[in-house]
Curated annotation (Swiss-Prot):
Mutant lacking the gene: phenotype: Embryos display head and axial defects during organogenesis.
All residue ranges annotated as the MRH domain in the record: 108-245, 340-467
Keyword terms of this UniProt record: Disulfide bond, Endoplasmic reticulum, Repeat, Signal
Protein's job: Probable lectin that binds selectively to improperly folded lumenal proteins. May function in endoplasmic reticulum quality control and endoplasmic reticulum-associated degradation (ERAD) of both non-glycosylated proteins and glycoproteins.
InterPro entries attached to this UniProt entry: Man6P_isomerase_rcpt-bd_dom_sf (IPR009011), MRH_dom (IPR044865), OS-9-like (IPR045149), OS9-like_dom (IPR012913)
Localization per record: Endoplasmic reticulum lumen
PANTHER family, per database record: ENDOPLASMIC RETICULUM LECTIN 1, OS-9-RELATED
UniProt key word Endoplasmic reticulum: yes
KW Transmembrane helix (keyword) present: no
Organism whose genome encodes this protein: Xenopus tropicalis
Signal peptide as annotated in the record: 1-27
Protein name (Swiss-Prot/TrEMBL): Endoplasmic reticulum lectin 1
Gene that this polypeptide is encoded by: erlec1
Amino acid sequence: MRRSDRLRCAGASLLVVLCGVFRSSFGGRTLPALSDDIPFRLKWPGPDFTLPTAGIPYKEDNYIIMTTADKEKYKCLLPLMANGNEEQDGEYKGPSPGALLEPLFKLSSCSYRIESYWTYEVCHGKYIRQYHEEKETGQKLSIQEYYLGKMMKKSTTEAGENQEEKESAESPKEIYTKNIEGQMTPYYPVEMINGTPCSLKQNQPRSSTVMYICHPESKHEILSVAEVTTCEYEVVILTPLLCNHPKYRFRTSPINDIFCQSMPGSPLRPQSLVKLEHQKEEIKSPLKPNKEEEQQLLREKFSTIHKPVTVGSQQQVTVGTTHISRLTDEQLIKEFLSGSYCFHGGVGWWKYEFCYGKYVHQYHEDKDTGKTTVVVGTWKADEHQEWAKKNLARAYMTTPDGVQTVKTVSHFYGGGDVCEVSEQPRQVIVKLKCKESESPHAVTVYMLEPQTCQYILGVESPVICKILDTADENGLLSIPN
């Protein structure tokens, strides 16, 4: 087939058929253009078939004749394709995206993203700040900060709003898109310039592009912060305000069904396809496990799925995402705070174990030599309280509606095994952070080593959201009322 005749399918069935095609001939007058951005799915209804009257439209003369490597012939009826953008194609006469975001800019609202070391502050329509707070001796607070960009004053005035409306009315502005989790998503860019000078770029000011994307249930959260080139950043913000503009709404592409009817002398489905699907079923259907294997499968539900990530500019050590079983939140919180439920993470040679209020271990398991364990840090309440007098154990943030909440707590675990390099005991700061997620029982664990044998362990989970506000002045947590 020619390149323009290729179809993208939802699944492997169509690919198998097309790979076995020798030739195709077209029925009707004109074959519609096919796009790789639109998904298709093959169906095999047989010779007696009535086209659907609802949904995606079809025409009797809109078909191609497909011939497989086994000389089987099929008449494949093609849809008049839908791409999910029908509403977007209509004329829109509402406010421009800039005007829709104007209330957010005028509110003097700020959003925050807390990572293991850095905190990112986006004050919409004003500036982006990256900072780290640390208490020094004598309770003096030390702040390391960089401005990643500032908004020019004219950009958020009524003049700027009128300019956006003028562009919308006279010549609609190009809609930019970004690949977010595998989906091309429309966004509205806001440029921030004149940030803190960058020593790596001859003291040129830092700059950022803030990408606002539609999310109906969001509260202007920061989805991600990335340094795309040296001292140039991209910040993705979720906001419900853009959802009022049809061209910025997220849409999933509908699957377009292609109905292939067998022609005289051909089976209902291609023989090669039937054979392949049979092989796939054999692979997917293992022997029924015995009782011991079933128990092992249950234990594996508590296992950790590991994957590497990059966190800020710090040296990456490990990361793990644990999917906790469906225990009740109350039971899970009690087990977590008692230290009886521990989190595991890590990739490569070393793995990590964190038990709240007990210890942080680094270990390696070998079938021949057994388990090797290094104590990274051990909990001692008095040592943590002394540490908390000089460091920030409980950090706050103000939500867009003006409510002050705890954003993160930090705990000190010292007295670990002696480090061969520094000849000092290992120690680790454990940072617990609320993380909103569609999966209420998902936990992300990552470890950094900003200095030799001095670690930062990050633990983020929706479960932690329920207990952060119980933190006392030392950052210690308790079971909520």
